[in-house]
């Protein structure tokens, strides 16, 4: 009986050692957060920055020594010792998860199982090399030829890049300038194109179809799709592409009806920000809104863009709320910068080339999208000297100056601006003071009717003329009895924040536990020149809101006079 118990102890200790290493390695998106939690960035020792790497190496050393020493000595006390060590490290992993990594578990679990798959492959090789020769199975022809056959098939399929092509992420129609960018993805490397009214528009690179990509982004004229009100995406897998010929797979297609922006009954739009993978809650909120002309997604739909699937998550959310039937406007968030695919994100969403600032035009709507990039200044420790946004910010200031000189916005009845990081709100760290001040000054000249923003994971309503600019803020006493050392810029336009998880204004759920994502619905009356703003939660309820930094309660509906920018509420 004792031998059985010690054998169980040995196995459990080794399994825990494997789990600790694989799980902590999968937590890579949270490593900088660990350093931050324990104080790095506040004049603490540099070793704190490298502590997560040191811990990961320590987990590896424990695992290897567990495997080697148990093999050499096979002592019961050794098994118990390693079980205790592995259990203590398991507690460390659980504490890290509890302190914040739990909000990233939807990233971490896929990475964990990916590592587990690699481990399974290594163990299979170990079995073939060290265990199989000692078994009676080596004399079994059926087993030997079965293994050989499976390995041969796997190698052939790998070499041929075998897959059955299909559309994995449905088409989303992004609005950029006077064009729509239709984006969809496939599980195989393939060519893609869009058919509208019998005319094909191709995903090309300098005249040649892109054949070795899984994400397909095709530009079409707005007027063409608005008139046709339907489009079909096509894809063909690239089986073989040689210098003098090739073979393409069968044509796979999907047809979607499209509803262009119709302002005959005014303008209605729905916006979300800081979804952070809560796509089901976002879809639920949108389901309660009967009609909207377009969608605005103001960034941070995910927390880290590390993989191809992460980059496609933007289109997953966009499709859930638009069904590919209405246009989507996208603004990049600070989390959308992070990860391996952050540099490739412009291929997956609406963007002007590789830039995330641009204008867009609908019937009676002039729109601007701005992008501050990261949420801290360039010298912030988390960016490890990889952030250099000064020129990018200046380019956007020049862009706004050019727009003012052209005055093209005067041809449109409604002026909408979008930026993930709030432009009129300067936080207590005083980040981006120059660019926010300059952007505010320029937007003040453009008769902006609404600036949508996110980032803070709160509902903040910035009403022009209500709070003295450039002065320390005091919280609404109904919300919090405290002051805030940030301030507001000197702005003359309404700005609404749309980044709140939860059901109510004061809810503060962890992202991983959020049962609701609050969105903002705006109904613009072009006859009376007003806009009515309503926050909705995932139960379809109107959210009762207040001004966070002023003693003012707005209720569930806010109506703004677009001429005077005066707010009335009920």
Predicted regions and their residues:
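Extended active-site neighborhood of metal-dependent phosphoesterases/phosphodiesterases
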Residues: 236-249, 253-256, 312-405, 438, ...
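Active-site-proximal segments of metal-dependent phosphoesterases and phosphodiesterases across multiple
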Residues: 407-451, 461
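Loop/turn elements at helix/coil->beta-strand transitions in domains of secreted/extracellular proteins
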Residues: 265-268, 290-295, 323-329, 362-367, ...
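Active-site environment of divalent metal-dependent phosphoester hydrolases
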Residues: 277-280, 303-306, 332-341, 375-379, ...
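Acidic, histidine-bearing metal-coordination/catalytic regions of metal-dependent phosphoesterases
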Residues: 3-270, 538-570
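Active-site neighborhood of phospho(di)ester-bond hydrolases with catalytic His/Asp-centered motifs
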Residues: 270-274, 294-300, 326-334, 370, ...
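An acidic-aromatic substrate-binding cleft motif
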Residues: 247-298, 303
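Acidic/histidine-rich helix-loop elements
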Residues: 31-40, 106-111, 203-210, 215-220, ...
């Amino acid at each position: 009986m004792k031998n059985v118990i010690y054998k169980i102890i040995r196995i459990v200790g080794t399994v825990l050692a494997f789990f600790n290493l694989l799980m902590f390695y999968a937590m890579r998106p949270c490593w900088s957060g660990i350093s931050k939690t324990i104080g790095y960035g506040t004049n603490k020792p540099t070793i704190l920055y490298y502590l997560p790497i040191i811990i990961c190496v320590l987990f590896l050393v424990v695992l290897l020594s567990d495997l080697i020493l148990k093999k050499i000595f096979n002592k019961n006390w050794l098994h118990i010792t390693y079980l205790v060590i592995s259990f203590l490290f398991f507690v460390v992993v659980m504490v890290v998860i509890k302190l914040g990594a739990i909000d990233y578990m939807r990233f971490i679990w896929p990475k964990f199982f990916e590592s587990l798959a690699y481990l399974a492959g290594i163990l299979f090789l170990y079995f073939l090399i060290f265990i199989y020769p000692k078994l009676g199975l080596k004399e079994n022809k059926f087993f030997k030829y079965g293994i050989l056959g499976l390995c041969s098939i796997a190698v052939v399929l790998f070499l041929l890049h075998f897959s059955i092509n299909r559309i994995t992420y449905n088409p989303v129609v992004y609005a950029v300038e006077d064009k729509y960018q239709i984006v969809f993805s496939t599980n195989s490397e393939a060519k893609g194109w869009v058919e509208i009214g019998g005319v094909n528009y191709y995903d090309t690179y300098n005249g040649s179809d892109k054949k070795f990509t899984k994400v397909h982004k095709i530009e079409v004229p707005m007027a063409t799709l608005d008139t046709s009100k339907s489009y079909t995406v096509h894809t063909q897998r690239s089986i073989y592409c040689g210098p003098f010929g090739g073979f393409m797979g069968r044509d796979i297609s999907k047809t979607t009806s499209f509803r262009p922006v119709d302002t005959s009954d005014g303008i209605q739009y729905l916006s979300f920000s800081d979804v952070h993978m809560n796509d089901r809650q976002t879809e639920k909120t949108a389901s309660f809104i009967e009609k909207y002309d377009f969608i605005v997604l103001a960034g941070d739909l995910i927390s880290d863009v590390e993989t191809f699937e992460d980059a496609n998550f933007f289109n997953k959310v966009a499709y859930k709320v638009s069904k590919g039937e209405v246009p989507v406007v996208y603004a990049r968030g600070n989390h959308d910068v992070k990860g391996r695919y952050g540099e490739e994100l412009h291929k997956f969403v609406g963007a002007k080339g590789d830039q995330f600032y641009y204008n867009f035009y609908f019937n009676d709507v002039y729109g601007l999208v701005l992008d501050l990039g990261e949420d801290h200044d360039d010298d912030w420790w988390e960016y490890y000297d990889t952030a250099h946004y000064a020129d990018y910010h200046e380019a956007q200031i020049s862009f706004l100056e050019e727009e003012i000189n052209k005055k093209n916005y005067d041809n449109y009845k409604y002026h909408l601006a979008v930026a993930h990081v709030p432009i009129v709100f300067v936080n207590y760290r005083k980040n981006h003071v120059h660019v926010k001040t300059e952007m505010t000054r320029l937007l003040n000249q453009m008769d902006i009717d609404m600036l949508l923003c996110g980032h803070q994971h709160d509902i903040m309503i910035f009403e022009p003329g209500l709070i003295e600019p450039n002065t320390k803020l005091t919280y609404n006493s109904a919300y919090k009895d405290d002051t805030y050392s940030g301030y507001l810029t000197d702005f003359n336009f309404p700005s609404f924040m749309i980044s709140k998880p939860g059901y109510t204004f004061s809810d503060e759920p962890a992202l991983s536990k959020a049962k609701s994502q609050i969105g903002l619905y705006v109904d613009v009356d072009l006859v009376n020149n007003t806009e009515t703003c309503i926050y909705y939660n995932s139960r379809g309820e109107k959210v009762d809101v207040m001004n966070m930094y002023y003693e003012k309660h707005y209720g569930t509906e806010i109506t703004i006079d677009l001429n005077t920018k005066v707010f009335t509420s009920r």
